[in-house]
């Protein structure tokens, strides 16, 4: 299992458009991947799950992966979040 914390940099957080990019990136990996906010954990490959967390700008989340490509998965998703989804 591999875990990293990241702060969502874009002002509006993970609304529909950036959440879609996040899920698309997560689905590139074989590992099981989760996003956790304040002890609530959801499947990072589920749009409804990610949106249900209500992640706004400035929120710190955990990206968690377990599987063969767990480090690559977490690092790629953290980089995407840190980029601000180019918004």
Predicted regions and their residues:
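Short amphipathic
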Residues: 1-10
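Conserved beta-strand core positions
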Residues: 4, 33, 59-61
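Compact, glycine-rich, soluble single-domain proteins
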Residues: 9-48, 52-57, 87
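C-terminal structural segments of small proteins and small subunits
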Residues: 52-87
């Amino acid at each position: 299992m591999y875990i990293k914390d990241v702060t969502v940099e874009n002002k509006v957080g993970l609304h529909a458009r950036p959440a879609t990019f996040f899920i698309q990136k997560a689905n590139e990996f074989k590992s099981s991947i989760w996003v956790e906010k304040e002890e609530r954990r959801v499947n990072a490959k589920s749009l409804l799950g990610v949106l249900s967390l209500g992640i706004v700008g400035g929120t710190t989340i955990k990206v968690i992966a377990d599987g063969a490509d767990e480090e690559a998965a977490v690092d790629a998703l953290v980089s995407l979040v840190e980029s601000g989804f180019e918004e």
